[in-house]
């Protein structure tokens, strides 16, 4: 009797490309997309998918879960930015900064330490702000106090705040009530940050 320990999935890259093109048709023309290809593209080959998407001008970059995944993409000579969505440990920060891997920031204290390290290294660090709009994981809660904290982060030396994101925890459900509440929180924070420059 044969024992199988792994699952094999054959991915049609033409189908992936078609799906991406269909998504692009459903958003505003000047909107860029980020390809989330964490966990090796959910087992479908992150590098192969990234290489397929690399020439697409509407793909801003790639998002992964860990630094190891980011370095794998960097080692594949991809030019577009790579963002680590998950938790990053202080002993990984210098590697991220050296390799221009984008980092998720979820506290002022973390951003300040990262800024100081980048300054000491004579480099810039590119960060994205994670908002917790209801997923209850990492991220800034939606408060005026945190809007102030994020505004302070944007002024730290050697730190470039490139973006802000959240995780819609129930977006695949038919009832969009909770997702719409999350979107409202995100948009509220966006407006609060605009007020603060």
Residue ranges, per PLM feature:
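Active-site-proximal beta-alpha core segment in soluble small-molecule metabolic enzymes
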Residues: 3, 7-10, 15-17, 31-196
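Glycine-rich phosphate/diphosphate-binding loops that line cofactor/substrate pockets in enzymes
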Residues: 20-31
């Amino acid at each position: 009797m044969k024992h199988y320990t792994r699952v094999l999935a054959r991915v049609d890259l033409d189908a992936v490309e078609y799906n991406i093109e269909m998504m692009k048709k459903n958003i505003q023309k000047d909107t860029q997309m980020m390809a989330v290809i964490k966990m090796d593209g959910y087992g479908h080959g992150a590098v192969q998918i990234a290489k397929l998407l690399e020439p697409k001008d509407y793909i801003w970059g790639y998002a992964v879960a860990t630094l190891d995944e980011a370095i794998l993409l960097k080692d594949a000579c991809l030019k577009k930015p790579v963002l680590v969505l998950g938790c990053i440990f202080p002993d990984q920060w210098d590697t991220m900064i050296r390799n221009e891997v984008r980092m998720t920031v979820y506290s002022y204290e973390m951003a300040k330490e990262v800024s100081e390290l980048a300054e000491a290294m004579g480099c810039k660090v590119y960060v994205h702000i994670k908002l917790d709009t209801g997923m209850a994981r990492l991220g800034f809660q939606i408060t005026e106090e945190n809007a102030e904290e994020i505004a302070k982060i944007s002024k730290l030396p050697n730190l470039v705040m490139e973006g802000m994101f959240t995780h819609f925890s129930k977006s695949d459900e038919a009832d969009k009530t909770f997702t719409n509440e999350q979107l409202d929180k995100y948009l509220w924070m966006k407006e609060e940050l605009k007020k603060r420059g």
